[in-house]
Amino acid sequence: MRNSKTNELVLTGLFTAIIIIMAFTPLGYIPLVVINATIIHIPVILGSLFCGPKKGAFLGFVFGFTSCLKATIVGGTLSSFVFSPVLAASLVGTSGIFKSLFIAFVPRILVGVIPYFVYIGIKKVLASEKKNLWGTVLNVLMSVFLAFGVYVFLGKMSESLSQAAALGIGIAVGAVVFIVVEAVFIRKSTQVIPFVYAGVAGAMTNTLLVMGSIFVLYKDAYADAIGVAGNAVLGVITGVISFNGVIEAIVAAIIVYLVGLVLNTIKPIAAK
């Protein structure tokens, strides 16, 4: 028990240091003009899994604090004010302080909580008598999500590629992944699905809650900042979710799975 607690504290300190380093170097954010695509949620997700939801929430708080600090000091994107109470207060008044604090912290704290329960829940499902059926169902959902991500990515990145071609490639990639995971991983190990879904859940928690909160709390100010009409904001936010969000989720799924397998041999994940 003592060794387990010590390992959790060491990992929490390590993940905290990684989050801080990633936040203030190019490693953590990918600037995409309208908003920063981030991979800082990955150590938060891993912390949630291997240190538990309480320490995961702390790591999420650190993530939120760094995004708030970076947005205030550095800026960098048109929408930096949504994470900075200082910039928001100067733009929309006192209410902006609370709105920006909510957006900067609440989604990120939940990134440190939700993946843990997703992982534990899926592990229990896959330990049931119908584990092969549930494994296949989850694999189908994962493959469809990946196919959609490839389709959106190709559609955004290549103007010369038709939508039909992008969709075909996406479906092909999704089908290949389904076959490989079904044939190689699921039948031999139940580790791949829980880790992958935990990664996706953490990434999408961040994207959906941040972008959803921006729409609810800052619709008009956000429209002015990025230079679009108010009625076009929903389309912009949907585009960010379907592009940034899907790409971030796929990257998170891969890294959480690969790193998670290694860490799980050192410190197995236990139910809290």
Language-model segments: residues:
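Loop-helix junctions at membrane interfaces
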Residues: 1-272
